[in-house]
Amino acid sequence: GIFSSRKCKTPSKTFKGYCTRDSNCDTSCRYEGYPAGD
């Protein structure tokens, strides 16, 4: 899809290391007020 390669626009302040599950990134991005990312 058009959003399949979307990433957080700003590095997460709370999420450390590599994302192992998209849901982790999505939650971190949303928690910090950014659009959902992969």
UniProtKB/Swiss-Prot annotation:
Subcellular location: Secreted, Cell wall
Coiled coil: none
Keywords: Antibiotic, Antimicrobial, Cell wall, Fungicide, Plant defense, Secreted
Xref: Pfam families: Gamma-thionin
A GO CC term attached to the entry: extracellular region
Keyword Secreted carried by entry: yes
Gene Ontology annotations of biological process type: defense response to bacterium; defense response to fungus; killing of cells of another organism
Tissue: Distributed in the epidermal cell layer of leaves and in the subepidermal layer region of stems. Not in roots.
UniProt-listed InterPro entries: Defensin_plant (IPR008176), Scorpion_toxin-like_sf (IPR036574)
Function noted in UniProt: Antimicrobial peptide. Active against Fusarium spp., Gram-positive and Gram-negative bacterial pathogens.
Recorded family membership: Belongs to the DEFL family. Group IV subfamily.
Protein name: Defensin D7
Organism expressing this protein natively: Spinacia oleracea
Taxonomic lineage: Eukaryota, Viridiplantae, Streptophyta, Embryophyta, Tracheophyta
